[in-house]
Amino acid sequence: MGLGATIALLCDVVVAGRSTVFADTHVKMGIGAGDGGQVIWPLLMGVNRAKWFLMTGERVSGEQLLEMGLVNFLVEDNEILDKALACADQLAAGPAQAISASKVPINHYIRMISNLVLPLSLSLEGETMRSPDAVEAQRAFVEKRPPTFGMR
């Protein structure tokens, strides 16, 4: 969830189990996501889908993750480590310089987009952390009730 999902999505290869669920739930706490979700989610799933999931905090199932291209492999939960190790072995046995030359430009592309988007998203995250909706979400969490958002 949130930052954890973003970190996973920034990995070179993502192996997920069938019960895996990703979500960026900042919005459910009245906060704009500012941890990189606005960078990687649109790149992997497309802008419209990313907007939906980031604006709603809706969960993305393992099957959806695979269908949308957010994960490379979907396996049974008890096979995650084995599949990840098999992927690592395959890459380790490959031509290191060619593999690096293939991924470095992609990482550079992601870094360039991050440099454009992250300052604004972090600023907006900070701004929304002080909003009445964020205060209400925190209060509701402590009181174990659903928040009632009202800031428009």
What kind of region is each of these model predictions?
Residues 18, 47-51, 60-67, 94-100:
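Short, structured loop/turn "capping" segments at alpha-beta junctions
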Residues 15-20, 71-119, 123-132, 148-152:
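C-terminal long alpha-helix characteristic of the crotonase
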Residues 37-40, 49, 61, 101, ...:
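Hydrophobic alpha-helical segments typical of transmembrane helices
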Residues 1-55, 68, 83-87:
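CoA-thioester-processing core
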Residues 137-152:
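Short, basic/aromatic-enriched C-terminal tail that caps enzymatic domains
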Residues 2-4, 59, 78, 135:
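Glycine-rich phosphate-binding loop at the start of an alpha helix
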Residues 12-13, 52, 56-58, 64, ...:
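Well-ordered beta-strand positions
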